[in-house]
Swiss-Prot record:
Family: Belongs to the RINT1 family.
Subcellular location: Cytoplasm; Endoplasmic reticulum membrane
Region (Disordered), start-end ranges: 1-47
Coiled-coil segments: 71-123
Organism: Mus musculus (Mouse)
Full protein name: RAD50-interacting protein 1
InterPro entries named among the record's database cross-references: EXOC6PINT-1/Sec15/Tip20_C_dom2 (IPR042044), RINT1_Tip20 (IPR007528)
Role of this protein: Involved in regulation of membrane traffic between the Golgi and the endoplasmic reticulum; the function is proposed to depend on its association in the NRZ complex which is believed to play a role in SNARE assembly at the ER. May play a role in cell cycle checkpoint control. Essential for telomere length control.
Subunit comment: Component of the NRZ complex composed of NBAS, ZW10 and RINT1/TIP20L; NRZ associates with SNAREs STX18, USE1L, BNIP1/SEC20L and SEC22B (the assembly has been described as syntaxin 18 complex). Interacts directly with BNIP1/SEC20L and ZW10. Interacts with RAD50 during late S and G2/M phases. Interacts with RBL2, preferentially with the active, hypophosphorylated form.
Length: 792
């Protein structure tokens, strides 16, 4: 750096004179500003005097006002104003003494800051010049140093490169030496190390190094794999692997012939050594995969020693079920499916007892039996992927294939514990083309089944008609078979891997239910003239049964899960309103609600037809009873024994016969709705058409009550404990008509005395009337003819 004397004088900063002038200008401006208020004050003095006078006048008016007595407070007011004046003057003096000091202090601080800034500006110019010259002198050194650093980094990369090559060659030499001394376990361990180095180099851009490393790993992996595989196959051959029967598996696992301990020890050793080659095998071997359209779940390759164990079975499978072999028949998928299941079953015990302990010992999470099953299932998937395109347009062959695959899947999962997360045949059936064909075939055969079940002679007969305990629902055979069909369809698709595919099958089921409902409606319309006939009742029982089963299914876990899946799909596609989505989410509705509502509507319509039919018959048989001479019947005291009105017999006989008939033909829940609906209509009919249409003397009222309470109501006592509760109009009308004279007069007076705003509810309740309104009771009282003569 240069000395301070060499720098010379620093020219004055251009900002200093500008600062001095600015100070002077500020002083001038302050003088002007100080003078300005004085002038303005003089100009506005006249206005301010007026304002002051107004303020004082308002203040005195507020404090004193027009009351002369308040003048006494002027002294106190003057004292308060004087004190306020003194305080204000003190504040003004205090402020006027402090402000100049503050201004002086601020000016002093500003001056000091200005001086410091001037000093910094004087030092800045020589420092800038010194630094610039220093950087200029150092630039050649920096360029030389940068070149040296670049050269050193290049040398370090070369050294690292050579280190990787050297390490790889050293590992390769050691593997060779171990193999020459037949130390295979040590060689396998070194190959694992080399594989780890290869994996570490995956992100490197040194393509030649990567190729060299990969070629070296591949070279030794092939040698070790071939040797270990050969030795392992030899041991397996001595164990008679693969087993052709379950008995052979038990024999190998249970008996201990000569040399067995050494044999199993070799099996253990070779299995572990092959496991060590798993990483390098996955690195070098491209996994064989089916096309992406099958959407198989991601899964690691089958463990290497299990691959060796699977090899002879894979060879047999391809020999028998590929090409032109007689065993490779499109119409017999059950042959290869059953063969795979048999192989899994034959080897399960050996895998669990001999192989699984080896995997557990080395800390592997692999399940030997499931890994073995997974390898065999992949053979099935490859076979299905190649066969299905040839079967798509042959309905019988395709349907047979699907049936056999579903049976295979069921046994695979239930008997052999195959997890649903693994690749399975359902993934192949879920492929778009195959799945749509499956839906089409499923619909076709379901409709054919519906046609046959409805045209059957036993379609409307319950198969449990002779077993009273079982036949509570009185379900006709066609409805039973139809719901069994739906249940079978559910079992067929419930293991599909995706919710979207399940929802498509659910839509198929709903379409089938709707189709069956339409068919039932068509048959029902043909039977409308015989609404009480056997077939009409069977249709009604079928509708009720299907609705009840669907409501029960709606609470099933499987369909609740589908409901949640449907909710997510509908929310994404904006198919439903917010209210409908909310009902689905809160489980207020179900996936079958639309179908259940349609069935319930049909059920109610059919029941209404039956009730109307019976009611018409009852009305026809009640014509004589309507014309009964209620006004002139003898009183109860004039009769030895009360008996049923002869004109009521046709009415009650018709009612009894129809109730018995429908009780036998309808299921319990439907019959309960039927008789309650009929009772409601009958109650209103008797009340409106018989009671309100006539006048009653004492004998007539007693006879009506006897007919109702001792004959009509007991007809319904078989179905409930208190049948009179379903005939409230009739029951209460009989009460009013049969009140003794005193009670009737008293009630009449009470009803006449109360106003509209004060109903006579208490008085009516006291005599047992709860249903009828006050006006109805007044009408009934006027229908009585046995009032005392008051002389009016």
């Amino acid at each position: 750096m240069l000395a301070a004397d060499d720098i010379g004088e620093v020219p004055a900063a251009p900002c200093c004179p500008e600062s001095g002038d600015e100070t002077k200008n500020t002083d001038v401006k302050s003088d002007v500003n100080t003078a300005a208020p004085a002038g303005s004050e003089q100009l506005s003095q006249g206005g301010s005097d007026d304002a002051l006078l107004s303020y004082v006048s308002a203040f005195i008016e507020k404090e004193v006002g027009s009351d002369l007595k308040s003048l006494k407070t002027l002294g106190k007011l003057i004292e308060q104003m004087t004190e306020s004046k003194v305080k204000l003057e003190e504040q003004v003096l205090t402020i006027s003494s402090e402000i100049p000091k503050r201004i002086q202090s601020a000016l002093k601080d500003a001056e000091e800051s200005k001086q410091l800034l001037d000093e910094f500006l004087e030092q800045e110019a020589p420092l800038f010049s010194s630094i610039s010259s220093h950087l200029l002198m150092a630039q050649p050194w920096m360029d030389d140093l940068g070149a040296m650093i670049t050269q050193m980094e290049e040398i370090e990369r070369h050294l690292a490169y050579l280190k990787w090559v050297s390490q790889t060659e050293e590992l390769s030499d050691n593997i060779q030496q171990y193999l020459m001394t037949n130390s295979v376990p040590e060689a396998a361990s070194l190959l694992v190390t080399m594989t780890e180095l290869d994996i570490q180099l995956q992100e490197s851009s040194c393509t030649h190094l990567l190729s060299f490393m990969r070629a070296t790993v591949k070279f030794w992996h092939k040698i070790l794999k071939d040797k270990l595989t050969s030795d392992f196959e030899e041991v397996l051959a001595q164990l008679h692997w693969p087993f052709t029967s379950h008995t052979q598996s038990q024999t190998v696992g249970g008996s201990r012939p000569a040399g067995t301990p050494e044999l199993y020890s070799s099996l253990d050793t070779l299995f572990c050594q092959l496991l060590k080659l798993q990483a390098s095998d996955e690195l070098l071997t491209e996994p064989k995969q089916l096309p992406e359209k099958y959407c198989l779940p991601a899964s690691p390759p089958v463990t290497l020693p299990i691959q060796v164990m699977l090899a002879p079975l894979q060879k047999r499978f391809r020999y028998h079920f590929r090409g032109s072999r007689q065993t490779n028949v499109m119409s017999k998928p059950e042959w290869y499916l059953a063969q795979v299941l048999m192989w899994i079953g034959n080897h399960t015990q050996f895998l669990d007892e001999k192989i699984q302990p080896i995997l557990d010992k080395v800390g592997s999470a692999v399940n030997a039996r499931l890994e073995f099953s997974r390898g065999l299932v992949m053979l099935i998937l490859e076979k299905l992927a190649s066969d299905i395109p040839c079967l798509l347009y042959d309905d019988s062959l395709f349907c047979h294939l699907v049936d056999e695959v579903l049976l295979f899947e069921r046994e695979l999962h239930t008997v052999h514990g195959y997890p649903s997360t693994f690749a399975s045949c359902m993934h192949i059936l879920s492929e778009e083309t195959c799945f749509q064909r499956w839906l089409t075939v499923e619909r076709k055969f379901a409709l054919q089944k519906m046609d046959s079940m409805l045209s059957s002679e036993a379609a409307w007969v319950s198969q449990y008609k002779d077993i009273s305990d079982v036949d509570e629902m009185k379900v006709p055979d066609c409805a039973e078979v139809f719901m069994t069909l739906l249940l079978v369809i559910t079992d067929r698709y419930k293991n599909l891997p995706t919710a979207s595919r399940k929802l498509q099958f659910l839509e198929l089921q709903k379409d089938l239910v709707d189709d069956f409902r339409i068919r039932l409606t068509q048959v029902m319309k043909e039977e409308t003239r015989a609404a009480l006939g056997f077939r009409y009742c069977a249709i009604l029982n079928a509708v009720n049964y299907i609705s009840a089963v669907l409501a029960d299914w709606a609470d099933n876990v499987f369909f609740l899960q589908l409901q949640q899946a449907a909710l997510e799909v509908f929310a994404e596609n904006n198919v439903l309103s917010k209210l409908q989505l909310g009902q689905l989410a809160s489980m207020e509705s179900s996936v079958f609600d639309d179908m259940i509502n349609l069935l319930e509507r049909l059920k109610l319509d059919m029941l209404t037809r039956q009730v109307d039919h019976v009611f018409r018959e009852v009305k026809d048989s009640a014509k004589l009873y309507k014309k009964e001479r209620w006004l002139s019947l003898p009183s109860q005291s004039e009769q030895a024994v009360m008996s049923l009105s002869s004109s009521a017999c046709p009415l009650l006989l018709t009612l009894r016969d129809r109730l018995l008939q429908l009780e036998q033909q309808l299921c319990f829940s439907l019959f309960r709705i039927f008789w309650q609906m009929l009772a409601e209509k009958l109650d209103l009919y008797i009340y409106q058409e018989i009671i309100l249409a006539n006048h009653f003397n004492e004998g007539g009222a007693a006879q009506l009550q006897f007919d109702m309470t001792r004959n009509l109501f007991p007809l319904f006592s078989h179905y409930c404990k208190r049948p009179e509760n379903y005939f409230k109009h009739v029951k209460e009308a009989c009460i009013i008509l049969n009140l003794n004279i005193g009670s009737a007069l008293l009630l009449k007076d009470v009803l006449q005395s109360v106003s509209e705003h004060i109903p006579a509810t208490a008085a009516l309740n006291e005599v047992g009337v709860y249903k009828l309104a006050q006006q109805d009771v007044e009408i009934l009282l006027n229908l009585r003819t046995n009032w005392p003569n008051t002389g009016k």
